[in-house]
Amino acid sequence: MLRSTLSRSAWRTGRHQAARNASRAFSATAQRPAEVELTIDGKKVSIEAGSALIQACEKAGVTIPRYCYHEKLMIAGNCRMCLVEVEKVPKPVASCAWPVQPGMVVKTNSPLTHKAREGVMEFLLANHPLDCPICDQGGECDLQDQSMRYGGDRGRFHEVGGKRAVEDKNMGPLIKTSMNRCIQCTRCVRFANDIAGAPELGSTGRGNDLQIGTYLEKNLDSELSGNVIDLCPVGALTSKPYAFRARPWELKKTESIDVLDGLGSNIRVDTRGLEVMRILPRLNDEVNEEWINDKTRFACDGLKTQRLTIPLVRREGKFEPASWDQALTEIAHAYQTLNPQGNEFKAIAGQLTEVESLVAMKDLANRLGSENLALDMPSGHKPLAHGVDVRSNYIFNSSIVGIESADVILLVGTNPRHEAAVLNARIRKQWLRSDLEIGVVGQTWDSTFEFEHLGTDHAALQKALEGDFGKKLQSAKNPMIIVGSGVTDHGDANAFYETVGKFVDSNASNFLTEEWNGYNVLQRAASRVGAFEVGFTVPSAEIAQTKPKFVWLLGADEFNEADIPKDAFIVYQGHHGDRGAQIADIVLPGAAYTEKAGTYVNTEGRVQMTRAATGLPGAARTDWKILRAVSEYLGVRLPYDDVAQLRDRMVEISPALSSYDIIEPPSLQQLSKVQLVEQNQGATATNEPLKKVIENFYFTDAISRSSPTMARCSAAKKTGDPRTNFMAPGMEEDRPMGQIAYGA
């Protein structure tokens, strides 16, 4: 839902200037700001003018208690827990809302400060229920921690009617509410309105009657809604799927990355035994800040349903369990019987495949004489229109954080709200705080920012670039064109890339400079950039059209089934019994991203790694080890025996893969022009409209399609009713894989 123009303009008024300056998330300036010197607890501190006093205290190494203040949110000043004493000021001041001033003398631990905080804590606890033994926030609750220091041993609040009681709200299948615990810090409201763009969440009433909720019972319509759980400093908002399942001290914590979209959000995987209990975000300001999308957070229950745990061999139309030796022997026998020549062996890689497995699969295919490699796409396996030899052709060149410097953005064939929800929040942030203008070529969607719709086909793109919006891009200091998967999967892809490439090349003075590259490709799948890095692509249309006799599906579930001949022998290697496994002759159980250490490259070219948080279920094996074993049975033994040797092979193919958490800048931008323009010269367009590549945000991969929680979200989104049951009649499309209706 769009914010009103009045709401957007309020960000630019003087009334909100201090709050904007006080939030580190919204500070961006080309010049070094003036410094202010002040004294905090006898220590001299220098900090940027306009910073909040609480930030100066943090710089001095002093931890200030707070509930409403958060570095990424606008200032509210609700809780008053951050009170400090300032000399020559008659009363304690809220350090989150008080800007620093030259020569200030601040005392953060004086008797006056301590007494003031004790008073605030007493008011907060006056109506707070004693739910700690049954509250999911127990053990990681800010109110618990701070009450140990500032709470009294008894309360003075007595009322005949008892403590305030507030009815719990139903916000959908993800967020569990216990509104008696709410301390009205409004973190959730500010996040929903300012970051997520979901103004349904707000406050009603005032004083003792103030309540947080959606007013009308409805879902919190945002792909980022789960972040309010992390923001809530008490147990008012907790995870509904995680309710009463574990305590934080019982969990093993593993730092990893998300692979359910192309962003590579940094996450922490909490496990107990072999089960992933929950997934939380990790701070990385260059990628996901502190946010993750709901699919990343809640689809983890899909890791334990529909899992492949033993090899399966299809006999007489039915799968039968087999040992690894039996399954690999069957594969070798089928290969010898069919005797595929060269490119008649085809390998298709899925969206969640890590670089190690891609390299092993590529080397195996090459040793068998085949170059017929493909990525699973519903549109088929033709070569990418824009070529993949130069990094700037397939990555987000401006970088994710570069969005916060853009002044004009053109979105072509992409819906960032579904393809990269956290990146979409960056666009919204820049739109709110600046005069950012956004144009869209493609199908529209329920956006969190205002945009100018320029059309849906190639002709509309040409008209836009030749018209007023093209002039805006030409005159912008930091223009951005973001090309999405809707273009790559479209029949007019060649024409789209030629048109965009010509425009970028003719305006290189502001699109391609030493400081800025405004051409960006938004990859929606975690494996895409890594596949292009190691050359896991079909080199020509002729090879792609070769009829295969033997097909290897490496975690591939999004393929076009018409591209696979009915008489081909199919091996599916993956971790879920999804679409690929259903058509396979042999199924080999692999590892999910939480069960292996694997290399992924995100949409901006940043190399990152998952880490094994749990062991492998049943007889499942790490994917590259499976391919290594297969190579011996096929008589083309791969030359690496451990993962270190395999990663040396990766770096041999692409040296950029040796630098983790670093974006290697493209060194041959002019060659990019050759591939974008000259390779597509004279491409004709059918002017078919661009289509949405993601119809259902909650069912985009094998893990999320197996998740009961994602099924509940899909059903609730479809009906608009948070109480919808996905097993009810009429909800067949919104069920997880393998589920049947009542009574069936």
UniProtKB/Swiss-Prot annotation:
The entry's function note states: Core subunit of the mitochondrial membrane respiratory chain NADH dehydrogenase (Complex I) that is believed to belong to the minimal assembly required for catalysis. Complex I functions in the transfer of electrons from NADH to the respiratory chain. The immediate electron acceptor for the enzyme is believed to be ubiquinone. This is the largest subunit of complex I and it is a component of the iron-sulfur (IP) fragment of the enzyme. It may form part of the active site crevice where NADH is oxidized.
**Record localization:** Mitochondrion inner membrane
Q: Where is this region: Disordered?
A: 1-26
Q: What is the lineage of its organism?
A: Eukaryota, Fungi, Dikarya, Ascomycota, Pezizomycotina
Give the transit peptide, as a residue range: 1-33
Taxonomically, the superkingdom here is Eukaryota
Q: Which organism is it from?
A: Neurospora crassa (strain ATCC 24698 / 74-OR23-1A / CBS 708.71 / DSM 1257 / FGSC 987)
Q: What's a single GO BP term from this record?
A: ATP synthesis coupled electron transport
The entry lists its GO molecular-function terms as: 2 iron, 2 sulfur cluster binding; 4 iron, 4 sulfur cluster binding; metal ion binding; NADH dehydrogenase (ubiquinone) activity
The annotation note on the cofactor reads: Binds 1 [2Fe-2S] cluster per subunit. Binds 2 [4Fe-4S] clusters per subunit.
| Residues where [4Fe-4S] cluster 2 binds | 182, 185, 188, 232
What PROSITE patterns does this protein's entry cite? 2FE2S_FER_2, 4FE4S_HC3, 4FE4S_MOW_BIS_MGD, COMPLEX1_75K_1, COMPLEX1_75K_2, COMPLEX1_75K_3
Location of the 4Fe-4S Mo/W bis-MGD-type domain: 251-307
What protein does this entry describe? NADH-ubiquinone oxidoreductase 78 kDa subunit, mitochondrial
